[in-house]
């Protein structure tokens, strides 16, 4: 498998909307790092924040990756223009999708090594992301 990192994305948690009158705090609004080195620790990438630590972050969910191979479906089926970090991912990948990666798989890019620890579930904050429908599994 030739898995490539297209983009490393980070963001700060902020209020992105309201649901049932309550502010929704989210770290979904990430931007691509440009010209910097990403330092990845046990709890994620330096400079990145997660808002709801009950479903994001921690040692088993420190970095969220999303395959660019899924973009054509979003464009065709939902009319959503995709770019790196559209779905709040820390790593925008190319060369494999969720069918090619299993929990426990390890990936190495130059020095760092990453392990697939769990499958992500959509966060409540996805409901506040413009143009991205919320899905529950």
Predicted regions and their residues:
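Electropositive, beta-rich accessory/interaction domains or terminal extensions
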Residues: 1-128, 134
